[in-house]
Amino acid sequence: MKKITINDLMKWKQEGRKFATSTAYDASFAQLFESQEMPVLLVGDSLGMVLQGETDTLPVTVDDIAYHTRCVRKGSPNCLLMADMPFMSYATPEQACENAAKLVRAGANMVKIEGGDWLVDTVKMLTERAVPVCAHLGLTPQSVNIFGGYKVQGREQDKADRMVRDALALQEAGAQIVLLECVPAELANRITQILDVPVIGIGAGNGTDGQILVMHDMFGISANYMPKFSKNFLAETGDIRQAVAKYIEDVASGAFPDLAHTIA
């Protein structure tokens, strides 16, 4: 696989070419994903739940993400590698810059932060200092205590309109990717069509430019709850490599997510 950059994703958006992405946490799986030409990987703070056994992502630290970012980069030298900025690691723009630098030094090409237009100054400061940003909207797991649980976001018209405004503001501030989680497909389609930058969805229908799954959900090995929008591709194929290939193929064709894995 050739080296993937944000320019490739922008080109694919313009061409209408959909792309698959996945979380990854170690060199072995990163190498497997690269062998199947997975273009984008995310070292997610989901590692707190799927690796560390926590009930949410809040205990994850910058050092945790940096460690796993180094591991993934060694296994996949050519992917576009995103790294989550954990809870309270970007409370101020200055703090965000300091912590983002640690993740870039660990091998990340881009950092992902959760939140709306209150992050505009942070996104501007990061991009001005050569740190690309993915803005995460919708269900932002670090806000679980504010939301009162993991709930679909953007069903009410005023909240949907607010999410559109947030997406535009973050793009204007310099965000190069927007990730939408657990939002109605119609809203995700609207945001995808309005934005110039690529939009990646999870639980947001198949109208986004890309899709992402937590790798443990893709293989059906999550310890507890399996979200409605996830699919066990290993059960369908019986082989890990074939499962990854099938996921990539189904995203590219628009077969995944289908209605059974879409939030209305």
Curated annotation (Swiss-Prot):
Enzyme active site: 181
Keyword Magnesium part of the UniProt annotation: yes
EC number, UniProt record: 2.1.2.11
Assigned GO CC terms: cytoplasm
Top-level division of the source organism's lineage: Bacteria
GO MF terms held by the record: 3-methyl-2-oxobutanoate hydroxymethyltransferase activity; magnesium ion binding
Family matches, as Pfam families: Pantoate_transf (PF02548)
UniProt KW keywords: Cytoplasm, Magnesium, Metal-binding, Pantothenate biosynthesis, Transferase
Pathway recorded for this protein: Cofactor biosynthesis; (R)-pantothenate biosynthesis; (R)-pantoate from 3-methyl-2-oxobutanoate: step 1/2
Function: Catalyzes the reversible reaction in which hydroxymethyl group from 5,10-methylenetetrahydrofolate is transferred onto alpha-ketoisovalerate to form ketopantoate.
HAMAP family: PanB
Known partners and oligomeric status: Homodecamer; pentamer of dimers.
Record's protein name: 3-methyl-2-oxobutanoate hydroxymethyltransferase
Organism encoding this protein: Vibrio cholerae serotype O1 (strain ATCC 39315 / El Tor Inaba N16961)
